[in-house]
Design a protein with these regions (language model features):
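Hydrophobic alpha-helical segments
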Residues: 1-116
Length: 116
């Protein structure tokens, strides 16, 4: 059994829960965060605003995906000032992080499969 096969059901369950399950943020926003993360991991420099991530999430999603370690309290306060709740901020952050993580996992597994 390959690494990909071993964890496929778990990854699928995680993705369904994060991107399709109920939440404070519309599923379409969480899915757009996932899609932006996948493109960013593949090397795309497309701005998040053009990838379907609505404002005010676009900058935050891109930062989570590319430079999560640079997120500060001021970034979170800016989202709150834009009218976003703690629950919405958490869900969108998780969607971007899981999207990036799954995209990186899939890339790594494809490289292993290719024998690199």
């Amino acid at each position: 059994m390959s690494h990909a096969d071993r964890y496929a059901a778990l990854v699928d369950a995680l993705e369904r829960s994060v991107f399709d399950g109920p939440g404070h943020v519309p599923a379409t926003t969480r899915q757009a965060a996932r899609d932006h993360a996948a493109r960013a991991v593949s090397g795309s420099t497309e701005p998040p605003q053009t990838s379907g991530v609505p404002d005010p999430w676009a900058r935050h999603v891109d930062k989570v995906v590319r430079h999560a370690y640079t997120i500060t309290d001021a970034d979170i306060e800016a989202l709150k000032a834009a009218g976003r709740s703690d629950d919405e901020i958490f869900e969108t952050t998780v969607a971007a992080a899981v999207g990036a993580g799954v995209a990186r996992l899939e890339r790594a597994l494809s490289l292993l499969k290719e024998g690199r």
